[in-house]
């Protein structure tokens, strides 16, 4: 059996609950590691049709003494809904899982969100473990305890904050990740670079210029640093009443774009990439961000092979209406995460309709800035 190899461990401590984020290789097939976080005789693995043929058997093999039930869901953001959630509940109930059971999320952000939400609500809360298999889930979605399903009206409208027992990031799972999915995950890394600034921003810029791949030697520690940044923020503000909202940089635009296209045109990270560019242009329009930084953001997204413009087929008025469902809204006021410079972002509730409209027009494909 391949030997377990640890790269880094990030500790997250929220509301008296502490858990590790373990960045490693061969963790998925290490019985000692997995069973450290499984305290009961019952386990439900939630995965999807893409990941199951690749890794489900490996995970089951390290749980031979457990009642190990499995739910295999359809793959894709469009399946992050009440029907899929009910499938998880049905399996838990039909297989007589008790309150001491553990749910394992084996997959990307969609699986983690749904399995986590099921764990937070089944019998008022059971243990769960995140085994993220996409770069986006590893650097962002699996850490911090956000769980949710989508509603036809908008993304992540129904959810909870519920922390896992552990996040085990086995970097070997990235070897089977499609190139497009890998690039989508880079968008969240660029987001962290903009939030943190300094040397981290410069390093992300440099590795993207060189060409960041799954084989890049810098990747494990970059993932660990992203997890550290997120852990530090969510430890201060678990329920997004303050500083955690900064993690939504670019997401007001991204979620509206995803909802507009029924989650069928872009992966989440691709929509975030467009949203980051929109946020940079909006910040420039408000006189906050220098144009050379906007150009740097654009180049980073291009180097990452990500989209950054809104297609001219999108109805901007309808897109603006969808932004009205944004979860950062307070007192009926739409709030945006703005960029003064890399490392200096803040929440702004004073963006005028004219400024927003001009921004949207300027980020449409084929339009001149």
Curated annotation (Swiss-Prot):
Q: Which cofactor does it need?
A: Co(2+); Zn(2+); NAD(+)
Q: EC number(s) on record?
A: 4.2.3.4
* Keyword Cell membrane found: no
Q: Pathway involvement?
A: Metabolic intermediate biosynthesis; chorismate biosynthesis; chorismate from D-erythrose 4-phosphate and phosphoenolpyruvate: step 2/7
Quote the record's cofactor note.
Binds 1 divalent metal cation per subunit. Can use either Co(2+) or Zn(2+).
Annotated keywords: Amino-acid biosynthesis, Aromatic amino acid biosynthesis, Cobalt, Cytoplasm, Lyase, Metal-binding, NAD, Nucleotide-binding, Zinc
The residues listed in the UniProt record as binding Zn(2+), with positions renumbered to this chain, are 188, 251, 268
GO cellular component terms, semicolon-separated: cytoplasm
Residues the entry annotates as binding NAD(+): 75-80, 109-113, 133-134, 146, 155, 173-176
Main location, first listed in the record: cytoplasm
**Function noted in UniProt:** Catalyzes the conversion of 3-deoxy-D-arabino-heptulosonate 7-phosphate (DAHP) to dehydroquinate (DHQ).
Looking up PANTHER family in the UniProt record yields: 3-DEHYDROQUINATE SYNTHASE (PTHR43622), 3-DEHYDROQUINATE SYNTHASE, CHLOROPLASTIC (PTHR43622:SF7)
Name of the protein: 3-dehydroquinate synthase
Gene source species? Legionella pneumophila (strain Lens)
